Amino acid sequence: MFTDQGPTLCELAVQALSSVERGYDLLAPKFDQTPFRTPDVVLDAVGRALAGLGLYGTGLDLCCGTGAGLRVLREAGVGRAVGVDFSGGMLDVARRGEPTADCVRADALALPFGEVFDLVVSFGAFGHFLPREWPRLFSEVCQVLRPGGQFAFPLPAPMGPGSLGYWAMLGFDGAMRVRNAVWRPPFVMYYRPFRLGDVRRELDRAGFDVALHALSELGERPDGSPRCGLVVATRR
C-alpha cells in the first residue's frame, strides 16, 4: 500500500497521535508516497471536466496539502492559482512543486480572502471537518467566490456492505473514534459522514446551486451508475 519512499509504521503512529496540524507537518515530506494523496487518475478526470465547464481567472485549492489540486487548477485553465492550508510543512512541499502558485497558511474556517475567486476546488479534505462545521466551511467558501463562481470537488459513490472498502472505511472511522476518546489532542479524520444528500442540503443553505457531473472515465458500479461524481456548487 505504501512505496519504499513512504513513511514507516512508526512514523505513521507518531503522526496519528499528534494534532491534525502537527501530524501533517510530520507527514509532509513523504505524504505524496502514501495512499492518502488523491490519485492522479482522479485529479486528471476532475481537471478535464472543469476545463469544459467554464472559464476561470482565479482559483483556490482549499486545504491544498502538498499541492496536487493546484495542478488541477492549471489544467482547468486558471490564470492565478492559490493554495491554502494550515500545515506549514505541507505548504513547503506545495511551494516546491508549484512555484508559480501563491501558498497561504490559514484556517479553512476563517479564509483571509474577499470575493476574488472564480473557482474553488478541494481534494480529500472533508473528513477533517465534523458535520457541525460544514455550514461554516461552506459559508467561508461562498464568501470568497465571486457571484457565479464554482466550488468543485470529487465525491465517490457510497460503498455497499458487500465491498472490502466499506468495511475498511467503517473500521478506520471506528479506530479514529476510539483514538479520540482516549487521546488528546484529537485527530479529526472521519470520511463516512460526508454523503451527497447532507452535503447538497448544506451547500444550498450556504448559497449554492448544486449539480452533480459523472466522472465516467473512473468507471461504473455494477448497477451502471458512476463510481465517482464531480460536485459543482455555483454561488448564487
Can you describe what each PLM-predicted range is?
Residues 60, 66-110:
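Class I SAM-dependent methyltransferase SAM/SAH-binding core
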Residues 135-147:
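A short glycine-rich, Lys/Arg-flanked "PGG" loop and its adjoining helix->strand segment in the class I
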Residues 182-197:
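Acceptor-substrate binding/catalytic loop of class I
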Residues 208-219:
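Conserved S-adenosyl-L-methionine
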Residues 221-236:
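Core SAM-dependent methyltransferase catalytic element
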